[in-house]
Structure formats: C-alpha cells, structure tokens
C-alpha cells in the first residue's frame, strides 16, 4: 500500500523522553507516575477494543462510530490529566502551546472534511429514497425514473470531495508533529508530552483510516512505528497490523466503494438493474435494498454525531487554552498598575 509520507526515522530527535521520568525526582514522580500509568493503561484498553472481532467488521460505519467515540473518550482523558497534573497554562512553555494549537487546528480541519463527506453521503440518500418510491410503483414510467435516480446516485458516490482529497496533506503534516518537544525542568511537562504522544498516535491512525475509507485511496492509510517501552504499543500495533492487512485486501477488490454498508447498497442496486430493464419488479426483491439503505443512513447519522462530538471537544480545548492565555495577558497588565492586585487566573481544561 502506498504511504502518505514515511514517518521520521526517530520520533524523538531530542533523545528518549521516556527515560526522563526517572527516580531522580522520586518524591515528585511518585505523585505523577500513577497519573501517567492510569492514563496509559486506559489508552491501551481503548486501543485494544478497536481490534475488530471479525474481519467483516473492518471499514464499516459501526466500526467508524466506535473509533470516533473512542477518540472522544481519549481526548476527554487528556483534558482530565491536565487538570489532575495541576499544570495551569501559566506554567506551559511556549512550544507546548504552539504544538497543542497547531495539532488541534489540523484535527479540526480533518473533522470538517469528514463531516462534509458524511453530509454528501446523506445527500445521496435522497436519490435512493426517490428511486425506491418509483420502484414500488412498478410502472414503466416510474421504473425509468428509478433507473435515472440510481444512475445519479452511483455518479454521486464515486465523485470526489475536495476536502477529503486534502486530507492526505493534513495527515502528512501531522506525522511530523509526532516529534516530542524538548521539556526542561518540568516533570509535569514530561508527563504531559508523553501522554499527548499516545493521543496523537491513536488520533492520527484512526484519522488515516477514515480518510482512506472516504477517499477510496490506500495512500491515506498510516503505518506508524512506536516505542516498545510504551505500555500501549502492543495494542496499537495489533490494531494497525490487523486493520491494514484487511484494508489492503478490500482495496484490491472491484467494488464501487470500500465502505461495507455503502457497497451493500451498491450491490443491491446492481442486482435490480436487470429487472428494471425488463420493465417489472418483484416487490419482495426490493426488501434487501431497503434494508441496506436504512442501515447505511442510520449508520452515517451515528458516525456524524460522534464526529461532531469530537469537533466540539477539540474546539472546547482550544477555546479554553486561548481564554487562559488572554487572561494571563490581562493579569500581567493589571499587575503593572498600583491600583490593581497582581495575580493570574486559571481555569482548568
């Protein structure tokens, strides 16, 4: 399979950040390491749950819903960790802020792209509903309208979405953010950067699967290497290896699309074409297509809700960070005035 961009040879150009959490600061580490261990244990568990029970579950809207729901939980988890670390924005180094803002805006762009594609797929649902209505009428004139609607639907499904086409560039730039910034004299900062690394890896891989499914191109699929020192590394590699191997086989098939529920509708449409052309439809033969259309529509709605949830979590995190930065700036100005008391306000994530 093609890769959007080979990841850097080493994700840690400034040295191994994991060894920085050493016993030199044993008193502080004894408080911080349980927080990190708990976060990474939960991360490993959430990643393990993404391994499909059956190969047929890969590239389904149900898996996509589960994956996006899992991302929401993980990103809420990092917000909780920041609060538990008692690491106010006033203690953040500028480069941490830059990294957070840069990554979050790219992820928001991906969310917008995924939402636009889900909306586009839902627009195709209207064509299917109109076609089914005419197929049930089962008259020559109605069957002609039905075939026209189904032809339009097929063209709609295979058409390109510019926002999805742009995902490859966004994913490639996100790969570069896997390099961890150097942290000086802040054990809390080291814990945060290590935790963020796990969040970024999970988010990047899942986003790549979404982009591959929506674009029909394996070039968006990620191949990431992670350190064996990480407690979630084995779970992640299992998910990646299992998913990538089967997705490769799916892309080698001759289906209209790679998304399972979407392909089920396309297959149902194809089976009805001979009867449409003959001018007569057995009402019973319509039921499988009706069921497939309903399953696809319901699934898309559920995935859309989870993507929207993820978008709101990202946006909330950015807004809170920016609000705290503005508050810090205001406090600095107030501190220079003899009429105002000095101090910095902090609101947790």
Curated annotation (Swiss-Prot):
Alphabetical GO biological process terms: embryo development ending in seed dormancy; root development; shoot system development
Superkingdom: Eukaryota
Tissue expression remark: Expressed in roots, hypocotyls, cotyledons, leaves, flowers and siliques.
First and last residues of the transit peptide: 1-43
The protein's role, per its UniProt record: Required for normal root and shoot development. Prevents constitutive production of a root mobile carotenoid-derived signaling compound that is capable of arresting shoot and leaf development.
Compartments where located: Plastid, Chloroplast
Keyword Transmembrane helix carried by entry: no
A GO-annotated cellular component: chloroplast
Pfam families (alphabetical): BPS1 (PF03087)
Extra remark beyond the main annotation: The mobile signal produced in absence of BPS1 is neither abscisic acid nor the MAX-dependent hormone.
Primary localization class, coarse: plastid
Keywords linked to the UniProt accession: Chloroplast, Plastid, Transit peptide
Name recorded for this polypeptide: Protein BPS1, chloroplastic
Key word Transit peptide present: yes
Organism of derivation: Arabidopsis thaliana (Mouse-ear cress)
Database matches in InterPro entries: BPS1_pln (IPR004320)
């Amino acid at each position: 399979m093609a890769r959007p961009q080979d990841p850097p040879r080493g994700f840690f150009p400034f040295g191994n950040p994991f060894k920085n959490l050493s016993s030199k600061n044993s008193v502080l580490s004894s408080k911080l390491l349980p927080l990190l261990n708990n976060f990474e244990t939960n991360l490993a568990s959430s990643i393990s749950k993404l391994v499909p029970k059956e190969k047929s579950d890969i590239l389904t809207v149900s898996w996509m819903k589960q994956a996006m729901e899992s991302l929401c939980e993980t990103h809420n988890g990092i917000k909780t960790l920041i609060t538990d670390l008692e690491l106010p924005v006033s203690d953040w180094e500028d480069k941490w802020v830059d990294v957070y803002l840069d990554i979050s805006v790219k992820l928001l762009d991906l969310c917008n792209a995924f939402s636009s594609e889900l909306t586009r797929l839902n627009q195709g649902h209207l064509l299917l509903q109109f076609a089914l209505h005419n197929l049930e009428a089962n008259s020559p004139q109605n069957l002609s309208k039905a075939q026209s609607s189904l032809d339009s639907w097929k063209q709609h499904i295979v058409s390109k979405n510019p926002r999805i086409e742009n995902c490859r560039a966004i994913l490639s730039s996100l790969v570069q953010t896997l390099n961890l910034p150097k942290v000086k004299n802040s054990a809390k900062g080291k814990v945060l950067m290590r935790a963020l690394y796990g969040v970024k890896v999970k988010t990047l891989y899942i986003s790549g699967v979404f982009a591959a499914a929506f674009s029909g191109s394996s070039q968006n699929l990620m191949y990431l290497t992670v350190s064996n020192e990480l407690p979630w590394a084995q779970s992640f590699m299992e998910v990646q290896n299992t998913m990538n191997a089967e997705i490769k086989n799916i892309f080698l098939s001759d289906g209209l699309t790679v998304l399972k529920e979407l392909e089920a509708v396309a297959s149902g449409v194809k089976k009805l074409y001979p009867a449409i052309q003959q001018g007569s439809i057995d009402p019973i033969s319509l039921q499988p297509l009706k069921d497939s259309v309903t399953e696809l529509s319901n699934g898309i709605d559920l995935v859309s809700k989870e993507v929207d949830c993820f978008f709101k979590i990202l946006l909330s995190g950015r807004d809170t960070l920016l609000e705290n930065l503005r508050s810090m700036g205001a406090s600095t100005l107030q501190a220079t005035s003899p009429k105002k008391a000095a101090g910095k306000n902090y609101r947790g994530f």
